[in-house]
């Protein structure tokens, strides 16, 4: 998954529930897109929608301002070379891509997006605008934050639902039709396997892992002796690497997925 964690249910189970609630078709996003950052995730999602002859794309966002999203996307397309030049300059300061993107957008048009659903929503619109896809984007207001612990009626964030499920708190059933006979697997259950792999691999081998940025292999080696998954992620997280980025790379290490010749990043 995009957040670098395992899905709590397989595709067929989730598809079945969607169909029960009136969805006509459900498409599975390729692994190469589903486990990437927002811009690549969105590219894959919109491409899949186009191939399915979808002409309206509906998504949730916190600000619910689709006109602003189109304005930003069109500005980036018109000033693409300058935009990426500014992004590269910001990245050299040792900050994450998301933060660099925020700063550049504020410079270019005086607006930026910082909330999780807004960021993904912008990437959907960017994919539509950049490729001139015949798709209309429509936004729905998110009433609960992506990581929020608060609930609104029967609506809760994905993060909060996952927390309830893994705490074996049956209150999760108020917010999702999913039911579990046994506890879903979690990536932290595989931390010892991850440690063995990192300890066995040399720096050059780690560099070949998909999404492994320059210097990250040394960071992994430095902190691999930490006893818990949470401690390792916290130690590796910085201004440059978000926790989600670290988790995604950990997933690729576990699956031993190497960088392709045509990188998606």
Regions found by a protein language model. Give the residues of each.
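Short, charge-rich amphipathic segments
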Residues: 11-14, 18, 59-60, 161
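Active-site cores that bind ATP or allylic diphosphates and position pyrophosphate for catalysis
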Residues: 29-265
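A glycine-rich helix N-cap at a beta->alpha junction
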Residues: 20-30
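N-terminal catalytic cores of NTP/NDP-binding nucleotidyl/phosphoryl-transfer enzymes
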Residues: 1-14, 20
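A broad, low-specificity signal for short, low-complexity segments enriched in glycine/proline
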Residues: 17-21, 211-212
